[in-house]
């Protein structure tokens, strides 16, 4: 089938969420992709930071094949060994306390926001408690994740969003400090902002935000969905700063496309 035929079929059948490039990929090996015309590409996108182990990795393929032949799915009503082992490994490399599995990065953000809300509820905070997020951030496109994404272009078509989200300037500690109050239950931010460039938190900033959260008994929630799983050099970017979040989200390269 010709490339244009695939594109025509996609335009007819698939909801348009991106302005796609006119390329139809067929398969990949390592860091290279191949389209339906046989053209080879060196892939610097990695499926938007997903394919951390590359394409057609034998260890990944064999692990998926082995598990699919045994048990492809079981609900959270029961235990299963792979989930337990994965949770233990994540705790070992992160030194966090518990693991909550979701289906995607944006769903992980939704889970983090629910943790913040439940935290405020358990503290007996008034219903108008606030969450501080960062301008120029990106946390996902579901309703809650979009509410803490500091970009009017993404937010405006879906207003009204979750209320009581305050936006500070990334790497501007005074901006964050000015928003803190007795209503603040959490701060959510990326350790390295990845929307429109690569902007790491400064050490002064991230340590200062950690101190503000401690002072006000608020949660520090770090989004490592794009920068985590070794992409910064450390397993998680926050580990290079000598701080530890109360909540961390990770995804993308965690699953390598599976």
Language model segments and positions:
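Conserved N-terminal phosphate-binding loop of PLP-dependent enzymes in the Aspartate aminotransferase
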Residues: 1-258
């Amino acid at each position: 089938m010709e490339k244009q035929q695939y594109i025509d079929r996609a335009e007819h059948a698939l909801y348009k969420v991106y302005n796609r490039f006119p390329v139809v990929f067929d398969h990949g090996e390592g860091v290279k992709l191949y389209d339906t015309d046989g053209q080879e590409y060196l892939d610097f996108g990695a499926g938007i930071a997903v394919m951390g182990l590359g394409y057609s990795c034998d260890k990944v393929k064999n692990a998926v094949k082995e598990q699919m032949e045994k048990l492809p799915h079981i609900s959270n009503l029961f235990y299963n060994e792979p989930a337990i082992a994965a949770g233990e490994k994540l705790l070992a490399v992160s030194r966090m306390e518990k693991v909550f599995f979701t289906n995607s990065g944006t769903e992980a953000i939704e889970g983090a926001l629910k943790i913040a809300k439940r935290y405020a509820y358990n503290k007996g905070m008034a219903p108008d408690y606030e969450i501080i997020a960062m301008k120029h951030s990106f946390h996902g496109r579901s309703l809650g994740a979009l509410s803490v994404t500091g970009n009017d272009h993404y937010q405006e078509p879906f207003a009204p969003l979750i209320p009581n989200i305050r936006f500070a300037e990334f790497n501007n500690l005074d901006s964050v400090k000015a928003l803190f109050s007795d209503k603040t239950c959490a701060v959510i931010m990326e350790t390295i902002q990845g929307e429109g460039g690569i902007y790491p938190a400064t050490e002064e900033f991230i340590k200062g935000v950690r101190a503000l959260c401690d002072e006000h008994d608020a949660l520090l929630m770090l989004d490592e969905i794009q920068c985590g799983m070794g992409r910064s050099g450390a397993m998680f970017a926050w580990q290079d700063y000598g701080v530890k979040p109360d909540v961390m989200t990770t995804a993308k390269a965690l699953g390598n496309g599976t």
